[in-house]
Amino acid sequence: INDTQDYGTPGVITEDAGMLFKVNMLDLTYEIEKLPSVLYTPGNSNGWNFDNSQQLVSYETGKYRGFVYINGIFKFTDAPNWNGTNYGNSGTDGVLSTDGGAGNLELPAQGEGLYFADVNTNDLTYTLTYISAVNIPGGFNGWDINTKMTSTDYLHWTIVADLQGGEFKFAFNNSWDLSYGGAADDLLYNGPNCKAPDGTYLVTLDLTSVPYTYTLTAQ
């Protein structure tokens, strides 16, 4: 390499977001594409309404995760409309297709319910983990991972709990493999413990949209 070679003026990206770089070394051109921060999940469960669909949040470049209520066919999209990239059925389990004629994704074998989705748009793969239990371990119950919350719509989960001990978290499927914690208005994936003054509360976990939240209503 010639140390005196002119490499041009360095470019600057001023936006904090995932970016996809495409470089053509033959003609020395490049493209920079901003990656979406969320994926949408239009389908039967929300009347194919983008505004009502759950969103999956980007956690690495091209990787998205989050909760979604599924009761029938659906798709993943990177825009709140059909004008972006739509991810449909490739015909192979766990593999997506961006072909315009790709069919809808099917309801998993576990049936209607809450699922935790993990989507990789880099290699067009995805997983759906069925949520069979929403748990609330904490100081008030000796961090019992099997204490369950209840729901009537799969997206709002409640329990009346005597929160003595100050800290608790939300866990899933009677396991610590998946948990959320942190601030009441911004729960984080495997985040820190939630904190509450001692008292008896109606605890409500809201998984309708991101960020996920919880409320405490004194009883």
Regions found by a protein language model. Give the residues of each.
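Insoluble glucan recognition modules
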Residues: 1-219
